[in-house]
Amino acid sequence: MTETSIWHEVQKFEIVRNFSNKLWNACRFLYPQLEQAGALAAELPMDKSLFALEDKWILSRLQTTIKDATRMLEEYHFAELAGFLYRFVWDDVCSSYLEIKKAVINSETLTAEKKNAMAILSYVLKNVLDLLHPVMPFITEELNSILFQGSEMVISRAWPKADESLIDAKIEAAFDQAFAVVESVRGVRGRYNVSPATKLSAVVSVDDAATEASVKDCMAIITELSGLSDLSVAVKAAKPKFSASAVVPGGELYIPLEGILDPAAEIARLEKEIEKAKAFAASIEKKLSNQKFVSGAPEAVVNAERTKLATQMDIIAKNEKALEELR
Protein backbone atom coordinates (compact mmCIF):
# COMPACT_ATOMS: atom_id res chain seq x y z
CA MET A 1 0.00 0.00 0.00
CA THR A 2 1.45 3.39 -1.02
CA GLU A 3 1.63 6.50 1.18
CA THR A 4 -1.10 8.08 -0.95
CA SER A 5 -3.52 5.16 -0.50
CA ILE A 6 -2.86 5.10 3.26
CA TRP A 7 -3.65 8.82 3.41
CA HIS A 8 -6.88 8.24 1.50
CA GLU A 9 -7.88 5.52 3.99
CA VAL A 10 -7.20 7.89 6.91
CA GLN A 11 -9.36 10.52 5.22
CA LYS A 12 -12.22 8.02 4.95
CA PHE A 13 -12.05 7.35 8.69
CA GLU A 14 -12.13 11.10 9.37
CA ILE A 15 -15.15 11.57 7.10
CA VAL A 16 -17.08 8.82 8.90
CA ARG A 17 -16.02 10.16 12.31
CA ASN A 18 -17.23 13.65 11.42
CA PHE A 19 -20.49 12.28 10.05
CA SER A 20 -21.07 10.23 13.21
CA ASN A 21 -20.52 13.36 15.30
CA LYS A 22 -22.97 15.28 13.09
CA LEU A 23 -25.65 12.61 13.54
CA TRP A 24 -24.97 12.39 17.29
CA ASN A 25 -25.26 16.18 17.67
CA ALA A 26 -28.55 16.27 15.76
CA CYS A 27 -30.03 13.72 18.18
CA ARG A 28 -28.47 15.46 21.18
CA PHE A 29 -30.02 18.75 20.04
CA LEU A 30 -33.51 17.23 20.17
CA TYR A 31 -33.19 15.12 23.34
CA PRO A 32 -33.22 17.90 26.02
CA GLN A 33 -36.20 19.50 24.31
CA LEU A 34 -38.09 16.22 24.59
CA GLU A 35 -37.21 16.07 28.29
CA GLN A 36 -38.57 19.58 28.74
CA ALA A 37 -41.79 18.56 27.01
CA GLY A 38 -42.01 15.43 29.15
CA ALA A 39 -42.48 13.29 26.07
CA LEU A 40 -40.74 10.48 24.28
CA ALA A 41 -39.84 11.15 20.66
CA ALA A 42 -42.00 8.25 19.52
CA GLU A 43 -45.08 9.70 21.28
CA LEU A 44 -45.18 13.08 19.51
CA PRO A 45 -47.86 13.26 16.79
CA MET A 46 -47.44 15.48 13.73
CA ASP A 47 -50.17 18.04 13.01
CA LYS A 48 -50.41 18.58 9.24
CA SER A 49 -52.43 21.77 9.73
CA LEU A 50 -49.33 23.37 11.29
CA PHE A 51 -46.85 22.35 8.59
CA ALA A 52 -44.66 25.23 7.41
CA LEU A 53 -43.13 25.17 3.94
CA GLU A 54 -39.81 23.81 5.26
CA ASP A 55 -41.69 21.04 7.10
CA LYS A 56 -43.38 19.94 3.89
CA TRP A 57 -40.01 20.04 2.15
CA ILE A 58 -38.08 17.86 4.63
CA LEU A 59 -40.94 15.35 4.83
CA SER A 60 -41.07 15.13 1.04
CA ARG A 61 -37.29 14.80 0.82
CA LEU A 62 -37.41 12.01 3.40
CA GLN A 63 -39.97 10.04 1.37
CA THR A 64 -37.97 10.33 -1.86
CA THR A 65 -34.85 9.41 0.11
CA ILE A 66 -36.58 6.28 1.45
CA LYS A 67 -37.56 5.26 -2.10
CA ASP A 68 -34.06 5.79 -3.50
CA ALA A 69 -32.36 4.13 -0.50
CA THR A 70 -34.66 1.10 -0.84
CA ARG A 71 -33.70 0.70 -4.50
CA MET A 72 -29.96 0.94 -3.67
CA LEU A 73 -30.29 -1.64 -0.90
CA GLU A 74 -32.25 -4.05 -3.10
CA GLU A 75 -29.57 -3.72 -5.79
CA TYR A 76 -26.76 -4.22 -3.21
CA HIS A 77 -25.23 -0.80 -3.93
CA PHE A 78 -24.01 -0.29 -0.37
CA ALA A 79 -21.31 2.29 -1.14
CA GLU A 80 -23.80 4.35 -3.15
CA LEU A 81 -26.33 4.03 -0.31
CA ALA A 82 -23.82 5.25 2.28
CA GLY A 83 -22.87 8.32 0.22
CA PHE A 84 -26.49 9.10 -0.60
CA LEU A 85 -27.59 8.98 3.05
CA TYR A 86 -24.51 10.98 4.09
CA ARG A 87 -25.62 13.86 1.85
CA PHE A 88 -29.24 13.67 3.00
CA VAL A 89 -28.35 13.76 6.70
CA TRP A 90 -25.56 16.31 6.45
CA ASP A 91 -27.03 18.71 3.88
CA ASP A 92 -30.80 18.37 4.16
CA VAL A 93 -31.43 17.40 7.78
CA CYS A 94 -28.59 19.10 9.66
CA SER A 95 -27.34 22.01 7.54
CA SER A 96 -30.76 23.02 6.24
CA TYR A 97 -33.80 21.87 8.23
CA LEU A 98 -32.18 22.04 11.67
CA GLU A 99 -30.75 25.48 10.93
CA ILE A 100 -34.16 26.76 9.84
CA LYS A 101 -35.99 25.30 12.87
CA LYS A 102 -33.30 25.83 15.51
CA ALA A 103 -34.86 28.99 16.95
CA VAL A 104 -38.32 27.39 17.13
CA ILE A 105 -37.12 24.19 18.81
CA ASN A 106 -34.82 26.09 21.19
CA SER A 107 -37.54 28.51 22.31
CA GLU A 108 -38.36 28.38 26.04
CA THR A 109 -42.12 28.37 25.50
CA LEU A 110 -43.61 25.02 24.55
CA THR A 111 -45.86 26.28 21.75
CA ALA A 112 -47.85 24.15 19.32
CA GLU A 113 -45.35 25.17 16.62
CA LYS A 114 -42.44 23.92 18.74
CA LYS A 115 -44.19 20.62 19.54
CA ASN A 116 -44.88 20.07 15.87
CA ALA A 117 -41.30 20.88 14.85
CA MET A 118 -40.07 18.39 17.47
CA ALA A 119 -42.51 15.76 16.21
CA ILE A 120 -41.34 16.21 12.61
CA LEU A 121 -37.67 16.09 13.58
CA SER A 122 -38.31 12.97 15.69
CA TYR A 123 -40.05 11.29 12.76
CA VAL A 124 -37.22 12.23 10.39
CA LEU A 125 -34.46 11.08 12.76
CA LYS A 126 -36.18 7.76 13.48
CA ASN A 127 -36.33 7.04 9.77
CA VAL A 128 -32.73 8.20 9.36
CA LEU A 129 -31.58 5.70 12.01
CA ASP A 130 -33.52 2.93 10.24
CA LEU A 131 -32.04 3.84 6.84
CA LEU A 132 -28.49 4.09 8.18
CA HIS A 133 -28.64 0.86 10.19
CA PRO A 134 -27.34 -1.46 7.41
CA VAL A 135 -24.15 0.64 7.06
CA MET A 136 -23.82 2.00 10.64
CA PRO A 137 -25.46 -0.57 12.95
CA PHE A 138 -23.79 0.28 16.26
CA ILE A 139 -24.22 4.05 16.50
CA THR A 140 -27.78 3.86 15.15
CA GLU A 141 -28.76 1.37 17.87
CA GLU A 142 -27.12 3.53 20.55
CA LEU A 143 -28.87 6.70 19.39
CA ASN A 144 -32.17 4.85 19.08
CA SER A 145 -31.90 3.66 22.71
CA ILE A 146 -31.33 7.25 23.88
CA LEU A 147 -33.76 9.19 21.70
CA PHE A 148 -36.53 6.61 21.38
CA GLN A 149 -36.46 5.07 24.85
CA GLY A 150 -38.75 2.09 25.20
CA SER A 151 -39.08 1.50 21.47
CA GLU A 152 -37.87 -1.70 19.84
CA MET A 153 -34.32 -2.02 18.54
CA VAL A 154 -33.65 -0.73 15.04
CA ILE A 155 -32.69 -4.21 13.84
CA SER A 156 -36.16 -5.46 14.86
CA ARG A 157 -38.08 -2.73 13.04
CA ALA A 158 -39.45 -3.02 9.54
CA TRP A 159 -37.58 -1.18 6.79
CA PRO A 160 -39.14 2.30 6.23
CA LYS A 161 -41.83 2.70 3.59
CA ALA A 162 -42.34 5.96 1.74
CA ASP A 163 -45.57 7.86 2.40
CA GLU A 164 -46.58 8.98 -1.09
CA SER A 165 -49.02 11.54 0.33
CA LEU A 166 -46.08 13.55 1.72
CA ILE A 167 -44.17 13.77 -1.57
CA ASP A 168 -44.29 17.19 -3.24
CA ALA A 169 -41.94 17.50 -6.21
CA LYS A 170 -42.77 21.19 -6.67
CA ILE A 171 -41.68 22.08 -3.13
CA GLU A 172 -38.50 20.01 -3.47
CA ALA A 173 -37.63 21.84 -6.70
CA ALA A 174 -38.31 25.23 -5.07
CA PHE A 175 -36.00 24.39 -2.18
CA ASP A 176 -33.28 23.12 -4.52
CA GLN A 177 -33.42 26.52 -6.17
CA ALA A 178 -33.43 28.34 -2.82
CA PHE A 179 -30.40 26.43 -1.55
CA ALA A 180 -28.55 27.18 -4.79
CA VAL A 181 -29.07 30.89 -4.06
CA VAL A 182 -27.85 30.39 -0.47
CA GLU A 183 -24.71 28.61 -1.68
CA SER A 184 -24.08 31.38 -4.22
CA VAL A 185 -24.32 34.07 -1.53
CA ARG A 186 -21.85 32.12 0.60
CA GLY A 187 -19.60 31.77 -2.44
CA VAL A 188 -19.58 35.54 -2.95
CA ARG A 189 -18.69 36.05 0.72
CA GLY A 190 -15.77 33.68 0.25
CA ARG A 191 -14.57 35.32 -2.97
CA TYR A 192 -14.49 38.79 -1.43
CA ASN A 193 -13.59 37.89 2.17
CA VAL A 194 -16.88 39.24 3.50
CA SER A 195 -17.58 38.06 7.06
CA PRO A 196 -20.70 35.90 7.64
CA ALA A 197 -21.66 38.49 10.28
CA THR A 198 -21.86 41.24 7.64
CA LYS A 199 -25.40 41.69 6.38
CA LEU A 200 -25.69 41.84 2.60
CA SER A 201 -28.51 42.74 0.26
CA ALA A 202 -29.19 40.67 -2.83
CA VAL A 203 -31.15 40.76 -6.07
CA VAL A 204 -32.29 37.62 -7.87
CA SER A 205 -33.00 38.24 -11.54
CA VAL A 206 -35.17 35.39 -12.83
CA ASP A 207 -36.15 34.30 -16.32
CA ASP A 208 -39.91 34.04 -15.84
CA ALA A 209 -42.86 34.64 -13.50
CA ALA A 210 -43.05 31.00 -12.37
CA THR A 211 -39.45 31.10 -11.14
CA GLU A 212 -40.12 34.46 -9.49
CA ALA A 213 -43.04 32.99 -7.52
CA SER A 214 -40.98 29.95 -6.53
CA VAL A 215 -38.09 32.04 -5.17
CA LYS A 216 -40.45 34.42 -3.38
CA ASP A 217 -42.04 31.48 -1.55
CA CYS A 218 -38.63 30.72 -0.03
CA MET A 219 -37.45 34.30 0.54
CA ALA A 220 -37.53 34.09 4.35
CA ILE A 221 -35.48 30.89 4.32
CA ILE A 222 -32.94 32.26 1.83
CA THR A 223 -32.58 35.46 3.86
CA GLU A 224 -32.07 33.59 7.14
CA LEU A 225 -29.58 31.01 5.87
CA SER A 226 -27.60 33.55 3.81
CA GLY A 227 -27.36 36.32 6.41
CA LEU A 228 -29.09 38.83 4.14
CA SER A 229 -30.66 42.07 5.31
CA ASP A 230 -32.69 42.44 2.12
CA LEU A 231 -33.63 40.25 -0.83
CA SER A 232 -35.56 41.28 -3.91
CA VAL A 233 -36.71 39.06 -6.78
CA ALA A 234 -37.86 40.22 -10.20
CA VAL A 235 -38.05 39.04 -13.79
CA LYS A 236 -35.05 40.36 -15.75
CA ALA A 237 -33.90 42.62 -12.90
CA ALA A 238 -31.07 45.02 -13.73
CA LYS A 239 -27.63 44.38 -12.26
CA PRO A 240 -26.80 47.01 -9.60
CA LYS A 241 -23.55 48.96 -9.89
CA PHE A 242 -20.41 47.41 -8.32
CA SER A 243 -22.06 44.03 -7.78
CA ALA A 244 -20.82 40.48 -7.57
CA SER A 245 -22.83 38.00 -9.62
CA ALA A 246 -23.45 34.27 -9.78
CA VAL A 247 -25.56 32.08 -12.03
CA VAL A 248 -28.39 30.31 -10.18
CA PRO A 249 -31.09 27.95 -11.54
CA GLY A 250 -33.53 29.99 -13.59
CA GLY A 251 -31.66 33.26 -13.34
CA GLU A 252 -28.80 35.22 -11.85
CA LEU A 253 -27.87 36.51 -8.40
CA TYR A 254 -26.49 40.01 -7.85
CA ILE A 255 -24.96 41.22 -4.58
CA PRO A 256 -24.18 44.96 -4.38
CA LEU A 257 -20.80 45.48 -2.69
CA GLU A 258 -20.80 49.27 -2.60
CA GLY A 259 -20.38 50.29 1.03
CA ILE A 260 -19.20 46.77 1.87
CA LEU A 261 -15.88 46.96 0.01
CA ASP A 262 -13.65 49.80 -1.16
CA PRO A 263 -13.57 49.30 -4.97
CA ALA A 264 -10.00 50.50 -5.52
CA ALA A 265 -8.62 48.61 -2.51
CA GLU A 266 -10.45 45.40 -3.47
CA ILE A 267 -9.21 45.55 -7.07
CA ALA A 268 -5.66 46.11 -5.81
CA ARG A 269 -6.00 43.17 -3.39
CA LEU A 270 -7.26 40.83 -6.09
CA GLU A 271 -4.50 41.85 -8.51
CA LYS A 272 -1.91 41.18 -5.80
CA GLU A 273 -3.43 37.76 -5.03
CA ILE A 274 -3.42 36.84 -8.73
CA GLU A 275 0.21 37.92 -9.13
CA LYS A 276 1.24 35.93 -6.05
CA ALA A 277 -0.64 32.79 -7.19
CA LYS A 278 0.83 33.00 -10.71
CA ALA A 279 4.37 33.24 -9.32
CA PHE A 280 3.78 30.25 -7.05
CA ALA A 281 2.18 28.25 -9.89
CA ALA A 282 5.15 29.02 -12.16
CA SER A 283 7.60 27.69 -9.56
CA ILE A 284 5.59 24.47 -9.20
CA GLU A 285 5.31 24.03 -12.98
CA LYS A 286 9.07 24.42 -13.25
CA LYS A 287 9.57 21.70 -10.64
CA LEU A 288 7.08 19.36 -12.36
CA SER A 289 8.70 19.93 -15.76
CA ASN A 290 11.94 18.52 -14.34
CA GLN A 291 11.83 14.84 -15.32
CA LYS A 292 14.54 14.04 -12.80
CA PHE A 293 12.27 15.25 -9.99
CA VAL A 294 9.14 13.52 -11.35
CA SER A 295 10.85 10.16 -11.82
CA GLY A 296 13.05 10.30 -8.72
CA ALA A 297 10.77 11.72 -6.02
CA PRO A 298 8.24 9.55 -4.11
CA GLU A 299 4.81 9.36 -5.73
CA ALA A 300 3.18 11.09 -2.75
CA VAL A 301 5.56 14.07 -3.07
CA VAL A 302 4.90 14.46 -6.81
CA ASN A 303 1.14 14.20 -6.27
CA ALA A 304 1.34 16.81 -3.52
CA GLU A 305 3.03 19.23 -5.94
CA ARG A 306 0.34 18.59 -8.56
CA THR A 307 -2.34 19.28 -5.95
CA LYS A 308 -0.60 22.54 -5.03
CA LEU A 309 -0.55 23.56 -8.69
CA ALA A 310 -4.26 22.78 -9.12
CA THR A 311 -5.02 24.85 -6.01
CA GLN A 312 -3.09 27.85 -7.33
CA MET A 313 -4.78 27.63 -10.74
CA ASP A 314 -8.15 27.58 -8.97
CA ILE A 315 -7.19 30.67 -6.94
CA ILE A 316 -6.15 32.48 -10.13
CA ALA A 317 -9.41 31.61 -11.93
CA LYS A 318 -11.63 32.67 -9.01
CA ASN A 319 -9.79 35.94 -8.41
CA GLU A 320 -9.80 36.80 -12.13
CA LYS A 321 -13.57 36.22 -12.20
CA ALA A 322 -14.00 38.43 -9.13
CA LEU A 323 -11.81 41.12 -10.69
CA GLU A 324 -13.84 41.03 -13.91
CA GLU A 325 -17.05 41.57 -11.91
CA LEU A 326 -15.73 44.69 -10.21
CA ARG A 327 -14.39 46.44 -13.30
Where are these regions (language model features)?
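Feature 926 captures the class I aminoacyl-tRNA synthetase adenylation module centered on the KMSKS loop
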Residues: T2-R327
